[in-house]
Amino acid sequence: MFIPQISTEVLAIKRPIRIGIIGGGQLGKMIAQEAKRMSIEIIILDPSENCPASSVSDEIILADFKDESAIRKLARNSDVITYEIELANSNALKILESQQYPVFPSPETLGIIQNKFRQKSFLRENNIAVPEFDRVKSIESLRSLCTAYGLPAMLKACEDSYDGRGNLLITSKNKIPQSFEFFHGKECMLEKFIPFVREISIMVARNSDGQIVSFPVAENIHNKNILDMTIVPARISKNVSIKAKKIAEKTIGSLKGAGIFGIEMFVTKDEHIIVNEIAPRPHNSGHYSIEACSVSQFEQHIRAVLDLPLSKPQLFAPAVMVNILGPENHNGTYKIKGLRELLSIPRVKLHIYGKKISKPRRKLGHITVTGNNVQEAILRANRARRMIKVVME
């Protein structure tokens, strides 16, 4: 069995290098778009033939993210495997890695991160500050933890959750029974609520040589647990920014494997920094980097998984990213109106993901706006978002 050796000469081989990606959503699409610029071929594994990445990939394997035989096929047809979704089958990927197939980030890292209780336990063991947490074993243990942590407290499904869909804030004791039933018997954990003054994130990349580089600190504003706006640079002190980068790089240094990682953190009023979650892939809060940085998070991910030199990101201008979400009460086909008006605004870039169906609060695209300063970019972004409307067909 021939396993290609990925090196700095990888782009000069006789045929194009092939990256296999588990997941064909918007992240896979944007990885593929950067890959095409470098003459790299992309093979997608996704259950939907009309997934966003299908329009820019060279081949698509139609299968569930956890399908072992499909993952093996992806490995046979690719030079390196990565993933854009935590739902990938980490056990199947561990087997491939043991057979010398290049899989990045490490399946061991994926296995740690895709279970939130396991992830938080790992971080705590590595002396990285996280909220107090514990596993919920029964309604009695939930009541006990709510008493210990105080309310509000955050109940989280440990697996198969994303975009806040696995989170539920418990605000009073009389809501404990319905909160316990909310996840229908799934493995859950309770976290002590952190009264933060800022939510921030940092994209950090590492290659197989151990080189680590960080992007600027981003400030995130959420609405109903889904990212609404990202502001770069974050409106925090220089001291907090330096501390956040050190913590983010320490976090990634404790994990195995190459790639790009998103580290979400809370900043408290006394400027303590607490790690919330890690994403072992490109992240929504890093989309601004396409227009606002010298290297995007997607190109950096490609560099990392191919063990190419990483580029130190430089921020060209303050930037704001806002998501375009599906309407609350609509499932089905849709149109996006207001594009002409939107594109009349200076320094606005529009990204439409090409999803065929809208679902409540589903990410359908995003807008990135740059400005001479943060406040100008925020005002311009708010003006731009008012012009966009997603309507049902």
Which positions does each model-derived feature cover?
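ATP-binding N-terminal substructure of ATP-dependent carboxylate-amine bond-forming enzymes
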Residues: 1-114, 118, 125, 140
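Peripheral (often C-terminal) accessory segments that flank ATP-dependent C-N-forming ligase machineries
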Residues: 7, 15, 303-393
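A conserved helix-loop-beta module that forms one wall/lid of the active-site cleft
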Residues: 107-168, 173
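Internal nucleotide-binding/catalytic subdomain
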Residues: 166-270
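Short, well-ordered beta-strand elements within core beta-sheets of diverse protein domains
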Residues: 192, 287-290, 367-370
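Active-site "cap" helix and flanking loop/linker of ATP-utilizing ligase/carboxylase catalytic domains
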Residues: 243-263, 269, 279-331
